[in-house]
Amino acid sequence: MVAARNPAILVSLLALTALPVSVVAEEPATATDKWHSVAKTDNQEAFVNPASLAMVGAFVEMRAKQNFVQPQPAAKKGKTFQSTRAVYRFDCAQRKVAMKELRAYAGPDLQGDTVQKAKTGDRNLQWLDAPESTVFGELLDYACQPR
């Protein structure tokens, strides 16, 4: 599914990451550990792939994985997902985040069938606030920290 065709689905998926979080103590990721936990709530945990950090113009781009405690409803009726892999763009100066790509998987840790896909072109990115102490905020803080 292309997000431009159904922006409501994209916004609802993004809303799942705007929940308050308890900050996870950051530990350095090793070469064998692709995903590094950065945020955890009662219903989800967010991970980043440090090797995916890249500058795209004035923005930082990074891959993230989210595991949900309970299955989340997918756009397709009767389908649910328990994990997502996304490519986010971050505007560090404005504390904004936009989702470039998203794949939702039936099981945790990106396992099982892909039940939903979304992709947005650079000109159609929907920028959302990334307040501190939310999943988006923690993802942005990780992406934007000086290296």
Language-model regions: role of each:
Residues M1-V11:
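Bacterial N-terminal signal peptides that target proteins for export
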Residues V21-R85, R89-R147:
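N-terminal secretory-pathway/extracellular module detecting exported/lumenal segments
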Residues V11-P20:
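Bacterial N-terminal signal peptides
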